[in-house]
Amino acid sequence: MASTAKARYNVGLKLYTFLLLLLSLIALVLGQEQPVHTITPFNNLPARLFFFDDTEAAIYHDSIDGNVYVSQDEGKSWSMAEGIPKGKTVMVIEHPFDNRYAFALTDSKIHYRTEDRGKTWRSFEVPVPPALVARPMSFHSDPKKWGSILYQGTACNRQGWGAICHDETYYTKEAFSDTPQLLLSETSRCQFAHSSKDFKHEAHSDLIYCVAFDTSSVDGSHALSSSRLFSTTDFFDKDRKVEELGIGKNAKGVIAFAIVSKYAVVALKDLSPSNDGEMLLYVTVDTNTWAKAQFPHASSAKLRENAYTIVESTTHSLAVDVVLQDKSSIGTLFVSNSNGTFFVESLKDTNRNDMGYVDYEKLYGVDGVGLANVVSNAKDVEGRGARKQLKTMITFDDGTTWTSLRPPSQDSEGKRISCDPADTDLCSLHLHSVTTPHNYGRIFSSPAPGFAMGVGSIGESLLPYDESDTFISTDAGVTWQMVRRDAHKYEFGDKGSILVVVNDEDGTDNVRYSLDLGKSWLKYDIGIKFRARALMTLPDSTSQRFLLLGQVARKDQTKDTGRVVIIQLDFSGTRKRKCVEGDFEKWYARTSKTECLMGHKQWYKRRKPDADCYVGEKYMDPVEHEDNCQCTEEDYECDYNFVRNGKDCVPVGPEPIPAGVCTGNPDQTYKGSSGWRKIPGNTCVDGVKKDEKVDKKCSQAQPAPGEITHQIHDFKHQIVQHAYFKNPKVKTILVRLMDHTMWQSSNEGYSWTQIHPEHRFLAFYHHKYADDRAYLITDTDTFFYTTDTGRTWIRAKAPTPPNTFGAQVLHFHPNTDNLIWTGNRGCSAQAQSCHAEAQYSRDNGRKWSLIDSYVRNCAWAKDAELNTDPNEIICESYRDKKGNQRLFQNENPMELVTGSNYYANKRKVFDHVVGFAKFSEFLIVAEMIPERRSLELEVSLDGIHFATGKFPPSMHPETHAYTVLESSTKSLFLHMTMSEAPAPFWGNILKSNSNGTYFGLALENVNRDERGYVDFEKMIGLDGIALVNVVSNPTDATLSGHKQLQSRITHNDGSTWRPLTPPVVDSQGNKYSCEGTKCALHIHGYTERMDPRATYSSPSIVGVLMAVGNVGETLAPYTESDTFLSRDAGFTWQEVHKDAHLWEFGDSGSILVLANDEEPTDHILFSTDEGLTWREYKFTEEKMRVRSIVTIPSDTSRRFILFGSLMRTPGSIAVHIDFTQLTSRKCDLSTDNPAKDDFEMWSPSENRPEQCLFGRQTLYHRRIRNTDCTVGEQEKAASRVVLNCACSKVDFECEFNHVKNTNDECELVPGTTPLPDSDTACRNGEEFWYERTAYRLIPYSSCTDGERPDRGREHRCPGFKSHSAWFWLFMLLLPFGFTALIAFYYYRRSGLARGTIRLPGDGGRPAYGGDTGVVATLASVPWFIVGVAGIAWEWVVSHVERLAPGARSGYRNLPIDEDAQVLRFEDED
């Protein structure tokens, strides 16, 4: 018994000993697995906290105290930087290419440099303090030139109480060991061309780009037009070049320059007179060739300053986010082709904040994968200010397609989520992104391959940050798991083998970490409670140590912690075994449907999730491996000289070939481009070979120099509609045939393709405001649209079939995504309620909303020049909305209804209207007055308030038909029919004052036809010049029915009209049979044209007119007429060819083409000297009847299309004629040395008695008539106003109720009264007002002083002007003392004083001239003084400028029309 007990004792003892040893071992193991930490206190949060690349050295910059701290052991211990005085540092900048160097900048001229990663610091001196920009230093990327650095500083010259400052850039070649030398003054940014490892090019190693001003400034301000991009290869010693960007002298207004990935990008503001603030981007990939970035929807995607962001881009695509609506924080993401020039829409409604940051980030190291947030309720946000609802989208193919994030099926506790993951519209994962940053560095990913984390929520849209949870993806975003409840900061370490998170919603005293890719989590207590502010590690995520930045509440602070702490977390002891080869796996990126991108699959070597080991490859970035894929169609793009047309690439013209390949044999072939090329950088092999050369006939090759070529295409049916896209860079034309088929040519008629043969097309529309958009209307509710000039056509659904009531189907808006569709509703057979219904879309037809039913016409009130509510819609709407609309008569009147907020707030404006129209800045409504059975003309300048038009006696519209004519010179032109039916029609032209309310007689007996069209045409490019035909025999024509027409021209906007001066001899040198004062030139006008686009003049050739007519007493029949030309805006004419011809201008007038318009022909005539000599080109053996000659709308191309038909063949033919090889020399335009270029200066006033036109003498550039060169697409030189002229009689017209008598003087019409006098001028700050006379100044004239027949007796304006100038100067300066105190307070509070964390960005202090001096100060004056000070300032400026030497009067701006008192809204805001 005792032995048994002893045995049991021994067994128990051994078991006890074993358990004791086991517990000790477990304790030992557990002790080894625990991380360790150290805590270092600081006074303030850092402005910068960073590691030197691939080192353990770190920098902590406290900008509040102005101190720099250094750690040499990954943040375990910290010490103040040796060699830098306390409290001096305002900025720390590390060298991006040399990890030994960093620079501590002060606000003085003395700064500090380390070349040993912060161990020691030495001072250096520069001539000026640093500029207030985000990065005042630029570095060279070449290891041999890492000492080359550019430094931007600010130089100031004190003047009185203030200082005049400008920025200067200095350079050093030895990292400031040498004396910095001045590079360039008046700069806003300079950068080495070699400053990015991805921007690879062969340029000079010292090439530098600078955005600087080409003029110096006394007061520190500059005109934006003086900002240019300069370059140099010798630090501006002898080499100083202005980068012309391929646009010559127009490369001005440069806002910014940046190098992004492999692209250099320049942003400049379009300073052309017609521009409305658009920004232009120019891109280069080789520093030699710059190209303009082309966006698919021209107007909609206009870049505006502070309204676009170049986001993170790849080496094969540039990405830009553009704000399409004013004052919006919603954008559209565009991605480019491989050379960064042609962009396509990638993602709509992207979320961005007011600072321009966009919710878009690419996953690090994984090609093609990116995350973005979109605003799912964009319409409500922009329409009624609703709160944004954000959804997260992901792309795996570089932005080509986007999908929702599929959520996990379970939460972090294993419970099923509350929605169905299969329904991604209502149940998807959404993540907080760039606009709400919650850590340093990248938002989602790190260099750890394939790992991504985020804070977000599952559901229909993103929840607020403090209601979100933490998620992880280990396969680059394909799948996600919830790893922690609540929002956390997160970081990856040891190439992803360690994950660390810390609570980011509240204070905490611990962190969580995972060693198995987030499957399980361990807790580690820190020992103090803090609020996490940042969590970071080495930039390459290869370390096992982390830095946790925390803020400690006052109640939790101790003497060892302070209010800010840096906690180093060391996980190096948690695992003892280093991973070996068997612990790794091959991980392929993008395991979604699209594994290949840019021709290869991408894979990394990554630790297996369950491997219990550490990677330990510190400072070694993950190595990317590529497996090449077989080539597919996605690996190719259009070759040079080819453009996309649907699924094909078609040539823009004949292909250039090497000399000697084609020897003249018509059947000979050559190896030419297929139209495709492999995308540069693409590595695919085998598979589809779209870039192989193909056999082509030599007849298709580019002709030899001097030769003309043609190509004929047969259409089986008649052409009923054709039009080019308006974009001058695009050569695409659309054609619709009688059989309802659509055809397209992307190379100016050289080749043709049919668009969607399976559909019948009723019409097509080009977008009025977007040069790249067009819409094809079918006979169903399907329509097609393009946003890239026809390269792709997108199918869309309309809310209804197109209407059959004769109304325009589509109406457009300057915001190009806004559309109005008018279609049929309930119009099936035997329908009793068939009517027209209008709906609007704000997303280019994706979604539609009802406007109104039973309408005849609905349109946007907003127009390019009509300044109305952009969301207002105007409708002609029937009062009674029932029954069949086709049967409506006058008993159901048509009302005019306007509705703001997209017709939500409707308002009936008129009870009975005939219709409305928009012309220039005028909205015109024809109102029916049933009780008087008459018409009233109502005019509005804002779409809300209307004024009734006032007409001379006997010319009121109540008894006459009228036509509103083209109006572009701040006045309305109206043709009012004066003849009675059924006699031939003619009438009077009336012209309004500048607000469209008072109409005066301009010309009597002007011809019109039975359709209401008028022989009236304004000249393109020169305002105020117009041609008309008048009926010279109105009395006889009433009886005989035969009108005799004569032509008239005006050069002062209708004030006076003269006959056209005939040439002395005809085109054969013979004198005309008609002689004497009754003989004049008469030309056929608008009413006789088959194509109304065949205008007398061209937008590309200022001053040139062509017409068909005759010299005689009256106009002869068309077939008895000849062809005439004027080069001086109609002052003189010459006959250029016998017989009537169609004509077209090409290459800005260097080519003029004629085709016989009297009979079929087999040839054309062309001239290269504007009609002095003619040559013939035969293009067919069988004669054709030419119906029209067309070229691109800008008339800058050298290719033409003849549309017509053969005599014995049904259908139509299109003849493409190419003059590109006729002349090879490009015209030289030199505004600096005009005597030696190919252009001459010309003024419209050269051949007229008066020197000036509209009160100014203007000079234009035009090509010398007989020079042999091609103008091409080079930018035209701007016109130049030489001087503003003194007013003369031609600058005035008759006042309302006045007409000219036989002495050419204005007199009051008998039985009428003149307008009452008005002191309106006093509202504009004038000192005097004048009584009315019989004359008024033509609104478009800018003349000054001189004769003023419009001014009667002078009266002094009442009010403020009775005080002296010195009184108002004193009143103006009085508030400045208070302003200085307020300004000083805001200086201390705003961050401009040293000691704040935030530093201004590059755009923080613009150097461009704007509101400077006193005007800028007015913004700080207390509100109750602004009214008085503003009036005083206006008075002071007007008088000081009048006295200042060299002051210019310039153009007068009349914000209130001189006749404004007739408007019912004159005193309304």
Curated annotation (Swiss-Prot):
Pfam families linked to this entry: Sortilin-Vps10 (PF15902), Sortilin_C (PF15901)
Signal peptide: 1-31
Glycosylation-annotated residues: N339, N995
Keyword Transmembrane (UniProt): yes
Top-level division of the source organism's lineage: Eukaryota
Placement of BNR repeats on the sequence: 69-80, 112-122, 393-403, 471-481, 512-521, 784-793, 839-850, 1049-1058, 1166-1175
Listed Gene3D superfamilies: 2.10.70.80, 3.30.60.270, YVTN repeat-like/Quinoprotein amine dehydrogenase
Role noted for this protein: Functions as a sorting receptor in the Golgi compartment required for the intracellular sorting and delivery of soluble vacuolar proteins, like carboxypeptidase Y (CPY) and proteinase A. Executes multiple rounds of sorting by cycling between the late Golgi and a prevacuolar endosome-like compartment.
Protein family according to the UniProt entry: Belongs to the VPS10-related sortilin family.
Name of the featured protein: Vacuolar protein sorting/targeting protein 10
